[in-house]
């Protein structure tokens, strides 16, 4: 069976919420691995992946057709902006990675509720 077949099977059995949870779990795991190692390339990759995730959420929440309540959308957009700013500080060595992990875990808690 090809990789595409597995992806199709996975997409048909997961709800959008489960897909979002899985993606947050993968990104958060990558961020947590960076705490254990001191490799800058791993840190840069994990931070970039996390920023892309949040940028996608921000873009989706900016769309008029998004069905989330306006206050929720505004909160996600605010978090995405914070994630971007904090990520830059982490990459410059001016901040720790833990707050990014904590925010992602909070989102995961909400998705699993």
What are these regions (language model features)?
Residues 1-55, 62-65, 74-113:
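N-terminal intrinsically disordered, cationic/polar leader segments
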